[in-house]
């Protein structure tokens, strides 16, 4: 767990970087048993075609570059690619968009990912307070975080009881619990993720400055959750 994650962190720091690309961040999460999609990093078009075939169409493509952390601004995320022909076209387009956005961008490759079925969007974040150390944050994604600031915080490490309270304390909890005849979300999967993030950060507190799992798709009770996008900033 820790050894595997540390190896990735040390490689990033050795390159003089503190911002991990999404692929690296997800590898760290995966080392701690967090649910990430079955994605593969393609360095060539041939690899991209091979991985898309293995994963099964439709797929998503995301260009990985340490200079392009806001991928949607740079138009380097392509969704719902349905065929090899379309993938070839999008491969050219995604690289062209990256060059326009940051001509000096170093490109690590393109992440080929399955198209995920949408779930309830939640966000899990970590920040470091100079006085109290690392804190973990939880809330519903989108408007709830951005506009309503409906989030809860706890100092790391957290207990299972803390994780459950973090979830029930948000104002939007009824949405997760299954208000108005909606199917309840998989609360146990969220509890598990909060505990695993807490353990990860507690183990690696000397290295991690902040972390953002946004969005996380949470499915119906018993169906789990998956980290759709992730960002980790390391201490320099």
From Swiss-Prot:
PROSITE patterns: ATP_GRASP (PS50975). ATP binds at residues 52-63. The keyword ATP-binding applies. Keywords: ATP-binding, Ligase, Nucleotide-binding. Residues 26-62 form the ATP-grasp domain. Optimum pH is 9.0 (at 80 degrees Celsius). The keyword Oxidoreductase does not apply. GO terms for molecular function: acetate-CoA ligase (ADP-forming) activity; ATP binding; metal ion binding. Optimum temperature is above 90 degrees Celsius (at pH 8.0). It catalyses: acetate + ATP + CoA = acetyl-CoA + ADP + phosphate. Belongs to the acetate CoA ligase beta subunit family. Heterotetramer of two alpha and two beta subunits. Catalyzes the reversible formation of acetate and ATP from acetyl-CoA by using ADP and phosphate. Can use other substrates such as phenylacetyl-CoA, indoleacetyl-CoA and isobutyryl-CoA, but not succinyl-CoA. Seems to be involved primarily in the degradation of aryl-CoA esters to the corresponding acids. Participates in the conversion of acetyl-CoA to acetate and in the degradation of branched-chain amino acids via branched-chain-acyl-CoA esters. This is Acetate--CoA ligase [ADP-forming] II subunit beta. It comes from Pyrococcus furiosus (strain ATCC 43587 / DSM 3638 / JCM 8422 / Vc1).
